[in-house]
């Protein structure tokens, strides 16, 4: 029971999965036949366990042959004592144990869509027996700005991020003809 009591008393809340604020914004500008539409979303507050990064920072002997994250090059050595990356020790099974070291902010700003279009003047489209013609280019999931490069905090509903695929970036072009 002493162990259970010590363990229970040693645990502390280190953050919250739930964000403080979520939101989005969009805007459309039109001038001289051109139109530009932008939409974005954001989240402030909340934490996520970056297990993808944790897995790439492994040092255990059973992990031979696995890739490492580039940050492993900053590991502690007698010549590199000013670092936040522990020394490499294949015999230390706790080197990448779950801890607050892997807890990162789930704040993000996502540029969801940008669309740029041009509507041809009526005097040009009338000759083709059209009511209107619009050319456009659109990009979805254009950019994500987050606390750690490579993590997509939009993917986690369980406070754990472990190598999930992020939203696909797409670029499309189109023509809208109205008869």
What are these regions (language model features)?
Residues 1-17, 57, 69:
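Conserved small-residue
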Residues 33-38, 123-124:
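Repeated loop/turn-to-beta-strand initiation elements of outer-membrane beta-barrel proteins
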Residues 43-134:
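Extracytoplasmic gating/loop element in the C-terminal half of outer-membrane beta-barrel translocons
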């Amino acid at each position: 029971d002493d162990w259970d009591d010590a363990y229970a008393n040693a645990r502390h809340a280190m953050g919250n999965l739930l964000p403080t604020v979520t939101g989005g914004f969009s805007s459309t500008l039109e001038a001289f036949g051109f139109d530009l539409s932008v939409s974005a979303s954001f989240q402030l507050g909340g934490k996520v366990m970056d297990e993808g990064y944790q897995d790439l920072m492994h040092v255990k002997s059973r992990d031979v042959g696995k890739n490492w994250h580039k940050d492993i090059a900053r590991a502690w050595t007698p010549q590199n004592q000013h670092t936040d990356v522990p020394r490499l020790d294949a015999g230390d099974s706790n080197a990448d144990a779950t801890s607050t070291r892997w807890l990162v902010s789930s704040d993000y700003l996502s540029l969801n869509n940008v669309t740029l279009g041009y509507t041809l003047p009526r005097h040009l489209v009338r000759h083709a027996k059209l009511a209107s013609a619009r050319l456009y280019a659109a990009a979805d999931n254009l950019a994500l700005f987050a606390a750690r490069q490579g993590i997509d905090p939009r993917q986690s509903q369980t406070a754990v991020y472990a190598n999930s695929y992020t939203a696909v970036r797409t670029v499309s072009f189109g023509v809208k003809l109205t008869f």
